Amino acid sequence: MKQNYSKGEIINANLGIPPKEIKGHEQGMERPCVVIKSFNNLELAIVVPLTSKEAKYSLFTIVKILKATAGLTADSYALCHQIRTISFDRITSKRAKLDNKDILKIHSVLIDTLEL
């Protein structure tokens, strides 16, 4: 049975192994990501990768996600400047669902980042 995903779900995804599958500052390895949009019939999802490493610099494209509100093991940061489309084949598991407040924060930052 094929899996379906929805906006705001936190999933684990294999984003590639450096250096062969990752270039420059792209996020890689298996990591949690937030589903922004799922195209279930195409088995594709637009995701924002998460990291637990606090940035050494301030970017308006980074949204802090508290572990208590997201079912994560550590406070994390949504890297909205790293948005990408992935195949469902890259998704290894579902983790949790973001609360509406965090989904709206990410949505707002994506509007600014993508100049929509």
Describe the predicted segments one by one:
Residues 1-4, 27:
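Short, surface-exposed secondary-structure edge patches
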Residues 2-3, 67-116:
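C-terminal terminal-subdomain/extension
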Residues 16-20:
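Short, charged beta-turn/beta-strand-edge "cap" motif at the junction between a beta-strand
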Residues 22-30, 35-69:
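Compact nucleic-acid interaction/catalytic patches
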